[in-house]
UniProtKB/Swiss-Prot annotation:
Gene3D superfamilies: Beta Polymerase, domain 2. It comes from the Bacteria. Belongs to the UPF0157 (GrpB) family. This is UPF0157 protein VC_A0354. SUPFAM superfamilies: Nucleotidyltransferase. InterPro entries: GrpB/CoaE (IPR007344), NT_sf (IPR043519).
Length: 188
């Protein structure tokens, strides 16, 4: 995995700091609001299990990972669900087409590369798929999750950061979170 600078987080999505990847930051209008783990994690896990089965039926060779804050025990979150769908790079476009049959559309105003496509739920559920080419730099979604899962102190610091951003704009929140994410991903 490439470790060029890491930055912004949008709907739980970590993006690289280099200029083309900054486009992956979405534009959201409302101020930040967060929920304690016991207020959202069980429902996100149930929703993840539902989509995991549906994705596996469409893409039996895909790796399917619950990522984002809702996948980290005891983490404060916006209550959204992010799912990484890892596929062979040559099959990414076909995977995107198949996943769209589950009611997902390609996310506009965000990064789109041959190795990454972000899909959002079109029915109003706060669920996103990150369709990622296996072996690409975009597998860092899983790395960030795993680092926090292994370190309760990092989760506590992440929670404190998020709570301190309550009422902030999404832009301000992403800036503050970017520095934290960059530090976490830079740790050995």
């Amino acid at each position: 995995m490439s470790r060029g600078g890491f930055g912004g987080l949008c709907l739980g999505l970590v993006v690289m700091r280099c200029q083309p990847l900054r486009r992956a930051l979405c534009l959201l209008g409302d101020n930040m609001q967060f929920y304690k783990a016991d207020e959202y994690q069980a429902s996100c896990e149930n929703l993840y299990r539902k989509y995991e089965l549906e994705i596996a039926a469409l893409l039996p060779d895909a790796s399917i990972e619950h990522i984002g804050t809702s996948s980290i025990p005891n983490a404060v979150s916006k209550g959204d669900l992010d799912i990484l769908v890892g596929v062979n790079g040559k099959e990414l476009e076909n995977a995107v087409k198949l996943l769209s049959t589950l009611g997902f559309n390609e996310k506009s105003d965000t990064l789109r590369t041959p190795e990454l496509c972000m899909l959002e739920n079109s029915s109003g559920e706060d669920v996103a798929f990150q369709v990622v080419a296996n072996g690409s730099e975009f597998e860092f979604f899983v790395g960030f999750r795993d680092k926090l899962r292994k370190n309760p102190e990092l989760v506590q610091r992440y929670n404190e950061l998020k709570i301190s951003c309550t009422g902030w704009s999404h832009e301000e929140y992403r800036r503050k979170k970017s520095a934290f994410i960059e530090r976490v991903l830079g740790q050995a």
